[in-house]
């Protein structure tokens, strides 16, 4: 697994391993950022009804936020919703200091655009799903504040980034698939690390036999672009760090 952060992914599944951090950790990081950096006392949480990722991460965030003394107002929107004006109005009327919306990218773009159109001045706080060129495009030139947690921040490995950008620019299809620019998203870097982690397991097994590769995976240790990668008994990565980035609305890049 590359960026599947919900704890249930590996629960009771002995054949699944992943290299990303999990949502209980991510929710705590986000809550601490809201409290310490954004000085929030009240947070409006918004996610898709029935979506395990949204609802799970909102729950972990709420638990951590309340331990820090923050108040959380939680609401959900139905699948395929496209109008978030009433939810944004509620957040404003509730006196929220921050909007936390760990949604999928399609909803995220609408939330950013509609928040800007409504003149919502409170920060929009989100998770790894918002770490996308789509969000940068939606926020560029607008008076919005967007913060996201993620697995990698550009500038972390100059050699890798140079090669990756050269690869993107070398082919028009690569460039188009990357949103028409050479910005490196964390999911791309994680995909790179996941590939080489799997390769380490194949090397350790000395064969492509599935059972042998599976037996080798728990002992794999790999130094990737995103850091040290190893697994616990559940098949989850031993991760204890995350990045928080903000969308630069002038340049259209992450700071």
Indicate residue ranges for each PLM-predicted region.
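Flexible loop/hinge segments that line or gate small-molecule binding clefts
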Residues: 1-17
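Extracytoplasmic/secreted envelope proteins and their assembly/folding machinery
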Residues: 6, 27-31, 55-58, 62, ...
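Second-shell loop/turn segments in exported
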Residues: 14-20, 48-50, 146-152, 180-185, ...
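An alpha-beta-alpha
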Residues: 15-79, 98, 198
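Sec-exported extracytoplasmic/periplasmic mature domains
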Residues: 32-40, 62-70, 89-96, 113-120, ...
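Extracellular/periplasmic bilobed ligand-binding domains
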Residues: 57-154
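Extracellular/periplasmic periplasmic-binding protein-like sensory domains
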Residues: 112-192, 247-248, 252-254
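Segments of small-molecule ligand-sensing domains
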Residues: 172-189, 197-252
């Amino acid at each position: 697994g590359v960026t599947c952060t919900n704890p249930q992914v590996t629960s009771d599944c002995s054949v699944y391993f992943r290299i990303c951090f999990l949502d209980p950790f991510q929710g705590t990081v986000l809550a601490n950022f809201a409290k310490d950096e954004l000085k929030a006392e009240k947070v409006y949480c918004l996610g898709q009804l029935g979506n395990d990722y949204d609802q799970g991460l909102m729950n972990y965030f709420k638990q951590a936020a309340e331990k820090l003394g923050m108040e959380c107002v939680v609401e959900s929107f139905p699948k395929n919703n496209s109008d978030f004006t009433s939810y944004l109005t509620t957040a404003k009327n509730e006196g929220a200091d921050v909007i936390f919306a760990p949604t999928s990218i399609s909803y995220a773009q609408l939330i950013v655009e509609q928040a800007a159109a409504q003149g919502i001045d409170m920060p929009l706080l989100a998770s790894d799903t918002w770490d996308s060129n789509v969000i940068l495009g939606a926020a560029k030139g607008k008076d919005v504040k967007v913060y996201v947690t993620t697995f990698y921040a550009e500038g972390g490995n100059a050699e890798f980034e140079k090669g990756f950008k050269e690869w993107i620019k070398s082919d028009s299809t690569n460039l188009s698939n990357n949103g028409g620019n050479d910005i490196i998203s964390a999911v791309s870097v994680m995909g790179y690390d996941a590939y080489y982690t799997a390769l380490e397991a194949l090397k350790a097994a000395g064969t492509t036999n599935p059972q042998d590769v599976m037996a080798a995976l728990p002992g794999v240790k790999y130094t990737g672009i995103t850091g040290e990668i190893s697994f616990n008994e559940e098949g989850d990565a031993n991760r204890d760090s995350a990045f928080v980035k903000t969308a630069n609305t002038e340049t259209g890049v992450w700071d």
